[in-house]
């Protein structure tokens, strides 16, 4: 079955799980004592990359998620468990 690219994406950007992911990533960054700008530098990305993720404007693919978590020194599996516990 083909993927329905783009259709319904905005629904996912407002889902409880996406909000839980944003909150978990932001909490991990703040716990690490890293600013958005510093995280972007460490990821070799534009500052807007982190800002758009934390504002809910952009989703991460799985590889970006792993890189993000690793850069923060966070346990990616635990972050995912937090997201999976969210409903909706």
Can you describe what each PLM-predicted range is?
Residues 23-42, 67:
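Short basic helix-loop element that most often maps to the first helix and adjoining turn
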Residues 43-60:
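Recognition helix of helix-turn-helix/homeodomain-like DNA-binding domains
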Residues 1-11, 70, 78-88:
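Short, charged recognition helix plus adjacent turn
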Residues 57-69:
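Short, basic-rich loop-to-helix N-cap that marks the start of a DNA-contacting helix
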Residues 2-31:
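A short, Lys/Arg-rich alpha-helix, primarily the initiator
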């Amino acid at each position: 079955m083909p993927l329905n690219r783009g259709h319904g994406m905005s629904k996912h950007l407002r889902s409880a799980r996406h909000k839980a992911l944003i909150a978990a990533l932001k909490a991990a960054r703040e716990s690490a004592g890293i600013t958005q700008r510093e995280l972007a530098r460490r990821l070799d990305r534009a500052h807007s990359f982190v800002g758009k993720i934390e504002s809910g404007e952009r989703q991460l693919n799985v590889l970006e998620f792993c890189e993000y978590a690793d850069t923060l020194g966070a346990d990616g599996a635990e972050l995912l468990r937090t997201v999976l516990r969210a409903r909706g």
